[in-house]
Amino acid sequence: APDAAPASLYAPSALVLTIGHGGAAATATPERAVTLTCAPTSSGTHPAASAACAELRGVGGDFAALKARDDVWCNKLYDPVVVTAQGVWQGQRVSYERTFGNSCERDAVGGSLFAF
């Protein structure tokens, strides 16, 4: 039997992103969730899929490499927000969780990625 042809020329990049209030994903109730597909084109329920995919491509899909913008100043009011990303980035499994001190700190790091 001939070898099966690959289903796509692109490695899959499909993620589910969530946001919730709390100190950890295990105890926080997800308040919002979106899907994000970055290959072969940007799509999903994310409101800014193209910009979010561009941010991820800029750090090679390494969520931990996302840094806070220098031009954003946030207060220190502690109201923890946890974000998660589960799925596949360029064929590799992704499981990411990060807790920010508040929504402003989340927005300063994620840019459009966590803006949903």
Curated annotation (Swiss-Prot):
Main location: secreted
Disulfide cysteine pairs (residue numbers): C38-C53, C74-C104
Keywords: Disulfide bond, Protease inhibitor, Secreted, Serine protease inhibitor
Gene3D superfamilies recorded: Subtilisin inhibitor-like (3.30.350.10)
Family: Belongs to the protease inhibitor I16 (SSI) family.
Described function: Inhibitor of subtilisin BPN' and trypsin.
Full protein name: Subtilisin inhibitor-like protein 4
Organism annotation: Streptomyces lavendulae
